[in-house]
Amino acid sequence: MKNIKFSLAWQILFAMVLGILLGSYLHYHSDSRDWLVVNLLSPAGDIFIHLIKMIVVPIVISTLVVGIAGVGDAKQLGRIGAKTIIYFEVITTVAIILGITLANVFQPGAGVDMSQLATVDISKYQSTTEAVQSSSHGIMGTILSLVPTNIVASMAKGEMLPIIFFSVLFGLGLSSLPATHREPLVTVFRSISETMFKVTHMVMRYAPVGVFALIAVTVANFGFSSLWPLAKLVLLVHFAILFFALVVLGIVARLCGLSVWILIRILKDELILAYSTASSESVLPRIIEKMEAYGAPVSITSFVVPTGYSFNLDGSTLYQSIAAIFIAQLYGIDLSIWQEIILVLTLMVTSKGIAGVPGVSFVVLLATLGSVGIPLEGLAFIAGVDRILDMARTALNVVGNALAVLVIAKWEHKFDRKKALAYEREVLGKFDKTADQ
């Protein structure tokens, strides 16, 4: 009898179901919930998140240095960077406008009885927002945050933008050395990169356990009762995310001769993992690895993916625009066209460059709502369902960043079509065989 092997996607799905069942039980049995959550489930979930954070920085640095040293052309790198930022700005602006449009059409906040809504303490987000605003966050603030004063400190804090900036400079400096001096160090960084990808595969074996624990904690703490009063908001956010992924990104992919549906099938493991953990970082190493295998050069993949985690959060910006209009409708505030334009422009700035901030979507909303006169207290009403919405928007962030790599590779005429087709046959062939079993 053959040994039955389940793919990572099936293992994570099974872990999600078990986590939901256990969390549902614990939600109504508070006597056993507190001890299990504090002593077993939360630590088990935190271990997985810590493992992911442990491998992200070495992978980003090593792949960027290898990729940039391989390019060795500052002008070419500047061109890639400019195209990447332009693409990110256009796509996230489309996400903001789509979110505001859908919220105005479907009116998720209209007719909601505020007395039936539970509130959650958001003081921790308010203090974070004050810290971000006091640091002059904006275009110049973001530019200033690119340059690290201490790269070791930035690595310890996981600050992605300074790490990218340093790695690019280091790669350019390395590429200018004579080959006899350059190649040994490039070989070292290439070995580090390959080793860290092996470590990633080891960490992924623990993913089902981490997912089980994280889902169980979420359901145990919030249950499902908090969803019903906000069902229109939850459904609209999920519809908007599906629409953006399949239609908006689908059109972008088609214009580039790609298929977003094939991309989603290739990323099925990563999407399930990102959705269940609500963490984009959990799949960053595998996105870099898969997009390289799918035909994008390492010089583009290693730059676009980590940069996208700060500038191309499609799911987050889509959610933020819907949430802003929802809160306005909740309070009966009818925003004018001019106020909505201000909202779009404000979100275009505030949603960039603070990906490392805890509760980033809430921080962005707190920094944005006041600009159009929307009460900040309204965020307390949606904080209880934020985890559920965070799972969906994280999955869209993953698809958006993966597609961005392929778009920039196509734009630079560096996309390897033969390699991509071979990878499609390999991955989708395995997918079809698994489905038949």
UniProtKB/Swiss-Prot annotation:
Q: Which domain of life is it from?
A: Bacteria
Q: Where is it chiefly localized? A: membrane
UniProt keyword annotation of Transport present: yes
Q: Output one GO BP term.
A: dicarboxylic acid transport
What membrane topology does the UniProt entry give? Answer: Multi-pass membrane protein
| Keyword Cell inner membrane tagged | yes
* Role, per record: Catalyzes the proton-dependent, binding-protein-independent transport of glutamate and aspartate.
Q: What is this protein called?
A: Proton/glutamate-aspartate symporter
Q: What is the lineage of its organism?
A: Bacteria, Pseudomonadati, Pseudomonadota, Gammaproteobacteria, Enterobacterales
